[in-house]
Amino acid sequence: LQISYNVLQQEPTQIIAAARAIDMGIIIKEPLAQVAFEKPRPEGEAQRWELAQKRLAPGVIGDLTRVEASLRWLLGDTDVHTAIVGTTNIQHLQDNIDSVGRGPLPNDTTQAIAAAS
């Protein structure tokens, strides 16, 4: 199953769990929410942007970057098998690899993200 799922779009959780219950593999697209949290406040997606400002605020994720927090949040979901993370910047790729190498977020950070909704 290929589905959009990320720190800002968590609604597919039940779909992912149902797919795993029948042994389907899970591929995540848009794991970084199209980096909506790094862009200026858009007119059309203001609600999503505002959610990003809450869930990925420095007081929630500490000194992690928003990209690192987003990738490591996704790693905490054991139902996910892989994610498609596109980039044209080799440094961004290396940063993503380094972030994933640090493993899932600590439980307190994951809980703080959930509470910031």
Question: Where would I find each of the regions flagged by the language model?
Answer:
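Beta/alpha (TIM)-barrel catalytic core signal, keyed to glycine-rich beta->alpha loops juxtaposed to Asp/Glu
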Residues: L1-S117
